[in-house]
Amino acid sequence: MENVKNFLNLFVDYLQIERNCSQYTTVNYATDIKEFYVFMNEEGIGELRDITYQDIRLYLTKLHQKEFARTYISRKISSLRSYFKFLLREKYLQENPFSLVSLPKKEQRIPNFFYEDDLNELFSLSDLSTPLGQRDQALLELLYATGIRVSECCDIRLQDLDMYLDTVLVNGKGKKQRYVPFGSFAHEKLKLYLEDGRITLLNKQNNHHDMLFVNHRGGPLTTRGVRHVLNELIKKTSKTLHIHPHMFRHTFATHLLNGGADLRSVQELLGHAHLSSTQVYTHVSKEHLRKSYLSHHPRA
């Protein structure tokens, strides 16, 4: 096989410099492309210019056989379509076989979100007498208060946080910035963490940096670290919830819209480029539906 590593490196540079993609997006693109190279090796395809539409159909069939979600397969198609388009632009290829491939129809699933009882229990689990407990509580409160992505949360620096106006400057997808407010609960827990827990964690190994959230060694907290925090907290409950960090974002949007917030405002807070991305949250909770039913049905 040709030296595909050079092509991938050029594409990564293109994503970062010309398209201004975030590191998270760039890593996803690179991962999808590397996995496609594995498929090429398995099928004995030596060069990218040898890829045919039939090869792509075989690749997609294998993905479907592994029962991956449609969103996962769509992402892979988008990544490879962009990569081959780039190679076409660089005149390495004469045509883009992925241009013939349509994206799978999106599944209309209701996003998973927390009910208030679940949230309250989750918020009660952190031990506020410890530095890590203070960090965990501040982290959970900020995720729910702002609806920011976990990657955005891990990128927050001290100078991005305005404790006077209770706002945070968020660096979103495509390096687009937005200000997002947070409330009194998040303010209180952030203040405790900043004045106590964070300092203690940084001093453990004489670490000094300006990232807001830190790990147990005092280094910057990663997205994997956030998942670990949630997994450890859920072990302390009797619930069998399968939770992931993005559920705070789903919950933020759902609770705002159920509470009467307008769609455009929620779109801006979430940092969505398209309103259609926000409309997925216009579902209503079962509790909200039941209250509406009991209030209005004549034989309820």
State what each model feature region is:
Residues 1-300:
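Conserved catalytic core of the tyrosine transesterase superfamily
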